Each structure stands twice: as structure tokens, then as C-alpha cells.
Amino acid sequence: MFKKSNFIGTHQEKIDKYYYMIKELGHGSYGHVYRCQRISTGEVFACKKFVKKLIKNKKGLKTEIDLLRATDHPNIIKLYETFEDKHHLYLIMEECSGGELFQRLALNAKNNKLYTEKDAARMMKQILEAVNYLHYHGVCHRDLKPENILLSSMDECSQLKLIDFGLSKVLKTMDDIMNGAVGTLYYMAPEVILGSYNEKCDVWSCGVILYIMLSGNPPFYAKNEDKLKQKICEMKYNFDAPAFSKVSQDAKDLIRQIFVDSESRPTISDILNSTWVKENAPNASSETLNIDWGRIMKYSKLNLVQKSVINFRAFHMTTSEAQEFIDIFKLIDENSDGVLTIDEIKNGIKHCKFNFKINEDNLIKLFNDMDIDKNGLINYTEFVSALMDYEKSIKQEHLIACFQNYDEDHSGKISFKEFCRILRPQNEIERKELKELYDRFDDNGDGEIDINEFIQGFKKTVN
């Protein structure tokens, strides 16, 4: 059973054999962040370097890595692989060249420039969609703030990426109560300060971010921590800032609905369905979106190795490369939970242009062929994989990078064991089928697949 997370490698060795550190982007108490380049392919990433002895919250770091392995959403940062040596831990991640949302907000405030409601709504919607995905999957972030939101590029319409899951909590049910005040005080809900809360603490934090976007100021401010806690717990805020004279009643009403006690507070899903979000940040027009069902049918006929290569490429697509697919995915994802059901796909056909007539039986078959992790849902990477024009999108360097991901011991050959590590057969029948597939790629019959056999095998079978 293949999953996107199968491609996120864990390496107990020095990183400098594989990555070159281009320049430092920032640093903190834990270590440094670098812009880095993969030596074999030239691809550029961000590298988070931790000094192991300085890691104070090892449990939190493990939680973050585990969650990044599991999550698959266009507005959540991607983790590609990890390296660990005697003194350091390295996380290779998606590069976001636009910096922190906090920096953008601070620059706007300095230049006396605020976001329009449409711009604020566009960005808030992305944050809300990422948080909604987490909540649907039983995760509470617990530290939502502009410093933990990155912009994928310097472009004004850049996609946002949620980061830093070190304080996140995986819940057994969404009725679970959490204890212990964690997070950043300015964005902290009253119930978190009081020490007993649920996932709606994230809703409050989103309200604080929205308030700052629209006004340039935090809703709760005091000269010392105790007074700030008091103001938050008493929910003392106002719309007196000059900027609010130009803010719509719908926006103010939404903020009022958020800054209430937890039981009365709306869910993230409720906010996504609010008048203000829907009117100011509608989905991309279905008139401009096109689902190429012929391409999906072609993809459905590929074998598991081919699909894994295409999924690897889809997983490594930059946000700008994937923008059209993101728009289609979000249009079809009716409840914004970050995955697609068969019913959402059916309804999506009505909204998007498509160039292929398809009956329900064929649609169900295509759905099952797209669902390569067999969980009954189509996740984001699976969706992009099926829609992308892989013959144009997959270059030699992508095939090399995918081969190296299969080649866990870096021997220059893929063994059958390494083959199974990625493709994960669930029983003896699947293992036998994989062995037959492996032998088809092993052109010279020496019991291993080298780089040329891998590339030629992929190209031959795709063509």
C-alpha cells in the first residue's frame, strides 16, 4: 500500500553528502534555517538544522515530524526528508521565499498600509482551510499566529503555509479536553489561560489574526502579562482603531462571533461558510477550471511504480506549478476537510469543464485507481498526480530524485527490499505481484534495478 509518507526518508548520516547549504535564512534557540540545494538534482529547499543538545522539547519535535509526515494539504508546509548525525538533526522542507506573515503585517503597519477585506479574506480562508483539515483529522494546532504562517513567494497573491506543529495535540475525539496553557499569549483563548479547553482555541487565534490583518493592531494589549491575561479573559476589545471605520459590518460581526466563550464560538467550518468569507474570498471560477478526464483515465491504467513516481513528482511540485490543481481541488472539496469523497468528485463534474463523457461505474473505477493508499478518499497529492500532465512535468532530474528515494542505502541500485519499503505490499499476493513488476524493471536480470533500468522502465511503460 503506497502512501505519500513512504517517500519521506529518515537518514542516520551526515547531510553534506547530499545537500549544499546556500545561505542562512534565520536562527533561533534551537539552531538555524538555511536555503539548501540537493547536489544531485539542483532542487532548492529549506533546511531546519537543530543542535540536538539544545532541543528543549524533544516530544514536541517528534510530534511535529510525525504530523508533517501524515499531513497532505496545499496550505501546510511539506517535509521531504530528515537527516541525523551525532550532534545535529536536519529537516528538509519546502522553501517559502515570501517569509513570515508576521513580517508582511509589520511592513504594512510601518508603511501605514493595511490589507483590503478581500485580501484579508483570501489569506484567512487559506489559514482556515489548513486548520479545518487539522481539526477534521483530530489535530489541534495550539500555536496559531502570523509567525507560524509562511508565504510561499513574494507575490501579493502568494499561497500561505502553516508551520510549527511542536505544540500541536492529536486528539482521540474532538470532544477531548486539553489542559495546560501553551501557545503565545497575544493569540491565546481565555479557556487556554484558565487551563481547560478544546480545539476551538484555534478558532480564537484565527480571530486575533483576522483582527490584526484588518486594523494593524492586536485586539488585546496591555503593558504586562497579568493585565493582558485579564483583558483576554474578560474579552475586552473594541473597534476604535481608525482602520475599522472602513471595515464592513460583516467582518466586525464575524470577529464578535469569535471572541465569545468556547461553547458559543463557531467552528472553523462555520467561519468558512460565513457571509464574509464567501463574499470576499469565493472559490476560483468553475468557468476557468478544466478537469482532463482523458488524462485521469490514462493515469488509472499505469502500474504502481509509475504512479509512485508521478506521486513523488506531485509531492515535490512547487506551489506555483500546482496552483491550477489547488484551485480545482478546493472547488470540489465542498466541506473544506482537505480530502475528496466519491460524492464530491461526482458533484465536481457539474462545476468544472471536462472533456470526457463518463458513466458512474467508470467514475467509481477511476476513483479507486486514484486512491492509491486505499483509504476510501482522494487526498491532495493523489488528486494532483491524476490530473497533472506527467509526460511534460516529469524531467530526468525528477526521475533521478525518485530513484534516490527508493535507493535507501545509497548503493546506486534498488533492491527488492527497498522496492517493498516504498510500495508496502499488504499480503503475499501483493508481494508476488510486486516481484513480477520488479522483474520487469530489472532489464538485465541481475536481481537489482540500476538508475538506467529505472528511468527506461518508467519511460517505456508510460509511453
Each PLM stretch: what is its role?
Residues 123-124:
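Activation segment signature within eukaryotic-like protein kinase domains
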Residues 82:
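Activation-segment/catalytic-loop signature of the eukaryotic protein kinase fold
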Residues 310, 341-355, 379-390, 415-427, ...:
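Amphipathic regulatory helices of Ca2+-sensor modules
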